[in-house]
């Protein structure tokens, strides 16, 4: 009697089922073995994202020592020094567009929180607004300008003072370039009116320490002068003497070094004039 052969299609079906069953068992074993480490890594990533995107900002903002007087009716100034928007030429990493996006986003979030916490009436930009200002093309400048306006968006009622830096118009490793000075003045327009803030008794002057040029932002008959300069004037004795002889400022705001420093120059005449 001839034995009935085993159907080939049935054999293949059983083989496939066996393979699927073994694969399912293998995945279960893998999941059982790696489940806890995987959950830990995913949780760690989630915590990192939440911390970097929200908790770190909240924590830092609560640590800011911003003091307001009782029934505060003073004028609040917010100083933005050396934001240096990432450019299009020197950033040669594999993904420069991602770098620009991330840096812009970091600046935007920080500025929004600082603006809200300070209740600023005036925002002063102390130069180096763009990192590649002296070498970028017209198209690159226009792109950077659009990014700048998006990052540092503020109410129309907020007054603005713009001071140029060496990355904007030159001056540190090259001469100050007149064309760049003109471009800066055309696109970054100061909208400062001291009278509307009750500061009409003060003089406000911008000093370009790289070429000695001065720009009067607000002029009054008073001898009390506030100076804005990108380069730290107090670090250069001869320059400081010239500025004191010419303007005799009671207060100087500078940037450039990316470090917060306070210098006190006691002036009896200045104190007696209040």
Place the predicted regions along the sequence by residue.
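Loop/turn elements at helix/coil->beta-strand transitions in domains of secreted/extracellular proteins
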Residues: 47-53, 73-75, 119-121, 156-160, ...
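Residue-level marker for buried hydrophobic side chains located in beta-strands
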Residues: 77-79, 125, 162-163, 227, ...
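Extended active-site neighborhood of metal-dependent phosphoesterases/phosphodiesterases
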Residues: 55-69, 98-99, 134-224, 262-273
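Short acidic, glycine-rich surface-loop motifs adjacent to enzyme active sites
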Residues: 221-236
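Active-site-proximal beta-strand elements of phosphoester/diester hydrolases
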Residues: 74-90, 199-211, 226-230, 272-273
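Conserved beta-sheet core of the metallophosphoesterase superfamily
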Residues: 236-274
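Active-site glycine-centered loops adjacent to acidic/histidine catalytic or metal-binding residues
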Residues: 82, 127-128, 165-166, 230, ...
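N-terminal active-site segment of His-dependent metallophosphoesterases
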Residues: 2-142, 147
